[in-house]
Amino acid sequence: MSLGVGVTKRATTYGAFPVVALAATVMLETGERGSLSQAADGLQAHFHISDFWIGALPTSMTLIGILGSLPFGHLADRVRRTFLLAGAMGIWTLVMGLNALAPTFLFLFLTRLGVGVVEANGPASISLLSDYYPVRERAKRIGLYQSGALVGSALGLGLAGVFVDTWGFRAAFWMWIPLGIATVIVLLRTPEPARGHQDADFHHEEASVDLMGVDAASLAGKLDLPPPTRVGTLDYESCTWREAYGEIFRIRSMWFGVVGITVSSALLSGLGFWGVPFFKEVHHLSASAAGGYAVVFGLGAAVGVVSGGFVADRLLRRGIVNARIYVAVASSIIATIVFVPAFASSSLAVTLPLFLVGGFFLTLPVAPADALLTDVVVAPLRGRAAALRSIVRSVGGIAPLVIGGLKGAFGLQTALAVFTPIYAVGGLIMWFAARTYPADLAFVAAESSRLHAAPEAGT
């Protein structure tokens, strides 16, 4: 396909299959967390553990996520990423079987560390998405990828509740094994895209792009951006670890964004585990009924996670370069305003509508924020940048542990209501990214020109 005079399109065109395959990994990761919350009562009764230790279970996997992120991020920039993900999902599926057979709580706690392998492989998924689809579709595709989490939540909260009520807490682990095996097979059949070709095509399209584009970087030549605050000279293919990570640490907007997302994601992490127990304890529901009501939140969240990218892209087409940031900040504040009374109320008639609306605004920032963090990183460093972000964002995984401690002191209803404002705090931190995002974006555009001008000059 021609991009212009004498220029041929480099990137292969992919359909929906790759994003569905990658979304399956998020589905399993999120769904298993939901089913773990359904199994919480059975685990406490069987192993005689406190609220603090049951809250520590979802937190334990972040240990491997932290330790594994850097080496997996490096591998994501060097090896076939689809096979890397398939191997991680194979380990995850094995761990599910071990969890189901756990004879003691210590055994269960230690084997759950293997669940973190999927979280450590997050950089590979983000890197793949950037190479499967055109730059201007990035926010939309990330939104579709993240929607896998909503499918997982529906399975983990709804279906797992029925299984746990029928067969006991171990069913919350057994149910994922067939899906894990199927995901491994799908990933092995998923093609590996060429690295950087989508960005190269964007570089050639820049001369003719108009404001119908929906990626911030692709609008760099049409928006009133400041000049880059730094000049790129790094050879990304042969640079050392120190040079690569040194370059990543210079991206100020990315770090404001990732810290803001980390703080905000603590509520998502906490709600993912304690949401079902909230309906059980405060509204006195069974596991299956609580899971059914929790799906109401999932409906709002499903619309939000898909809509976020479209809303930000629409604003971007109007020339608002900080659109991703504005959407994330505004929705974080609105979600907080909605969820505080939702948790404080003891009436389902009040809580359910607020959960539906709150779920929408809680996930609305997800795709714009992830796209923002990708926009400001040059293509050859995306895997390693995503690895660093995963390490920082894993801190949000301690939320179930913190809420468990607050629950023991004040009760679950108060604990969730008190913890919720942290979501707005994360949004306000992200606001500071707006100051440096345009300049960082201009740097990526300049680097795209530099990197692709060199091979063309040599032909």
Task: Describe each PLM feature range.
Residues 3-12, 199-256, 282, 451-456:
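Juxtamembrane intracellular "pre-TM" segments in multi-pass secondary transporters
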Residues 36-37, 251-305, 366, 370:
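Extracytoplasmic gate region of multi-pass secondary transporters
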Residues 48, 80, 101-106, 284, ...:
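Helix-breaking motifs and short loop linkers at transmembrane-helix boundaries and internal kinks
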Residues 67-105:
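Conserved MFS/SLC helix-loop-helix module at the cytosolic interface between two early adjacent transmembrane helices
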Residues 83-97, 322-339:
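Structural signature of the two symmetry-related core transmembrane helices
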Residues 111-150:
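Cytoplasmic helix-loop-helix junction between adjacent transmembrane helices
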